[in-house]
Design a protein with these regions (language model features):
Chain A
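Short, Lys/Arg-rich, polar N-terminal cytosolic tail immediately upstream
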Residues: 1-30
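A structural signal for multi-pass alpha-helical bundles of membrane permease subunits
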Residues: 31-314
Length: 314, 274
């Protein structure tokens, strides 16, 4: 799927699977003991902090619990609560808005920019740094920066509005503007990684395809759309999954720091709503239900995407 | 003649769009040296009239050296633990044939679809039950335990080493630990570098887990100190000082990124599968 994976992975697969040599190998007890010893440290931490929480999350959704008292089994009551909780449905809408507004522009812009800087010209290697550099910013650092950019009194956008004699707009406190403003920052933050992944994907497109297309008289846009884009489909799939997860789950950091879910819940996505239910309302069971819902959404979107891409590639 | 003109057009597009993308960050650097009147000036200035280094002194005392040390300790511990657990595990899964290896491999695939923010609440529950909330172990261990990407990446790498190399060492009488340590590990340097850079960056920038697990003065990391500046910088301190604090928090990652850029892009491309 990626440079490392395919270059090395493909070779490795060819070398061993189901060769006669392998069938002859018997499991040796001494080997097994060594293997488990080498695995043990990773397994212990992984089971305690990933596998058990996953199971706990599913289990707790059937309990009423406040972190401290004994959990009380309530069956499907938490799920029933979800059905009538309009705030939860609003936050589900916010989550979907994050995904809808964020994912496609991130992919489209990232792809175009990667194609642009995938040029074999002297000096481009250095110029690429300009495109990669936002990757070093944490959400916290970029929040400090973008909160200033969006600030109505001191920020550049406010200044621009004043030039045209327009009234100041407090972007992050306007319910229709806050979410798009956060999404713009998230796109900016996500671009370096998307560009890097696409650059890796573009390296694997064989040069002679382009030569053939040029011979057939295809212009640059036609080449881009009919040759380059289909040839990086596997990268697009990976990028899409990463970005869906990014906008469903990582919007939590962004809205927690920049808008605290406001104004009027306009940026309270499911992730933040679940967070509040757990850590402000101490309703751990219900928060677990909301986490399960997010899990289902991610799996459903990815499954749907896979189904669509399969249909189109056949 | 035509290709030359096209080339110039492409160069200028690359430079122009690159500057647009990097602009907010360049402005952050420039703004961190502006005086209050510079940054509030209208129309906005691109460069400070005279650099005010005092901003950094103020930002430094706002952030406190303790917080900076905490961040290094947190990131360093996460990185060392991850390397110490993921490398041997990846080796065992790729080179040793034993019953159960497929099950273990499958187990490490589970979290590939589970973003860590979704496991936040149950991870907090488990860490709380272990009595680790509020201290350094609770901060580090759950993040270090996110080992699946590392294990899968190293497994992938070790499986590209020729079996003959491993067999030769085994026939010479080296046990698995020695084979791992003196044959496989030195060859893994490039992939270790790539994984380390990505892990360093990710851990340095974490916000929510440190907020939940260890928000106290003694254990607080840089992102926790910075976040309030995004909403209160305009009342408490000058935006320039906020910018300076952001720059201080950014410098270590920026250095790592610039020095190890090659490894970083390889690391992203390599872990991108997950």
């Amino acid at each position: 799927m990626t440079v490392l994976e395919t270059k090395r992975g493909a070779g490795a697969e060819r070398r061993h699977p189901r060769s006669p040599l392998r069938k002859k190998t018997k499991y040796r007890k001494a080997d097994a003991a060594s293997a488990w010893l080498l695995l043990a440290p990773a397994l212990v931490l992984f089971i305690v902090f990933i596998i058990i929480p996953t199971i706990v999350s599913l289990g707790l959704s059937f309990y009423q619990w406040d972190f401290f008292d004994t959990p009380a089994f309530v069956g499907f009551a938490n799920f029933a609560k979800l059905a009538t909780d309009s705030a939860a449905w609003n936050s589900l809408g916010v989550t979907l808005l994050f995904v809808l507004l964020g994912v496609i522009p991130t992919i489209a812009i990232g792809f175009m920019l990667a194609v642009l800087i995938n040029a074999n010209m002297p000096g481009v290697g250095v110029l690429r740094v300009l495109y990669f550099v936002p990757v070093v910013l944490s959400v916290a650092v970029s929040a400090v920066l973008w909160a200033f950019i969006y600030d109505s009194r001191q920020g550049p956008i406010g200044a621009l509005l004043r030039v045209f004699g327009l009234p100041p707009v407090d972007i992050l406190n306007t319910d229709t503007l806050a979410l798009p403003a956060l999404v713009i920052m998230m796109i900016w933050l996500a671009l370096p990684i998307v560009i890097i992944l696409y650059l890796a994907g573009l390296q694997r497109v064989p040069e002679d395809i382009y030569a053939a297309a040029a011979l057939d008289g295809a212009g640059p846009w036609r080449t881009l759309w009919s040759i380059t884009w289909p040839n990086v489909a596997s990268t697009t799939f990976v990028v899409a999954i990463l970005q869906i997860v990014n906008y469903v789950a990582s919007s939590l950091d962004v809205s927690l720091i920049m808008t605290n879910g406001g104004p009027l819940g306009a940026t309270t996505a499911l992730s933040l709503y679940a967070y509040r239910q757990a850590f402000s309302n101490q309703d751990v069971g219900y928060a677990s239900v909301l986490s399960v819902v997010q899990m289902v959404i991610i799996v459903a979107i990815i499954g749907l995407g896979r189904l669509i891409t399969r249909r189109f590639s056949r | 003649m035509r290709p030359a003109r096209l080339r110039i057009g492409r160069y200028s597009t690359i430079i122009l769009l690159g500057l647009i993308i990097a602009f907010p960050m360049l402005y952050l650097l420039s703004g961190s040296l502006m005086s209050f009147s510079d940054i509030a000036q209208y129309p906005p200035r691109l460069f400070p009239t005279t650099p005010i280094w005092e901003n950094f002194a103020q930002a430094w005392s706002y952030l406190t050296p303790r917080t900076i040390l905490n961040t290094f300790a947190f990131v360093g511990s996460v990185l060392l633990i991850q390397l110490a657990i993921c490398l041997p595990a990846g080796f065992a899964l790729s080179k040793i044939k034993f019953r159960g290896s497929k099950v273990v491999f499958g187990l490490f695939l589970v979290p590939v679809l589970l973003p860590t923010n979704l496991l936040l609440i149950p991870t907090f529950v488990v860490t709380l039950q272990l009595g680790l909330i509020g201290n350094f172990f609770g901060l580090v261990l759950p993040i270090a335990g996110q080992a699946s990407v590392g294990v899968l990446l190293f497994r992938q790498f070790f499986s590209t080493l020729p079996d003959g190399l491993i067999d030769a060492a085994r026939i010479d009488g080296a046990n698995w630990f020695r084979t791992f340590y003196s044959i496989a590990l030195p060859l893994a340097r490039p992939i270790i570098a790539a994984y380390s850079v990505v892990t360093f960056l990710t851990a340095w920038n974490l916000y929510i887990w440190p907020l939940l697990a260890a928000p106290g003065e003694q254990t607080r990391v840089l992102t926790l100190a910075l976040a309030p500046l995004a909403t209160t910088q305009f009342s408490n301190i000058s935006p320039s000082v906020g910018f300076a604090a952001a720059v201080i928090a950014m410098v270590p990652v920026l250095v790592v990124f610039v020095v190890f850029q090659k490894w970083f892009t390889r690391g992203i491309a390599g872990t991108g599968l997950e």
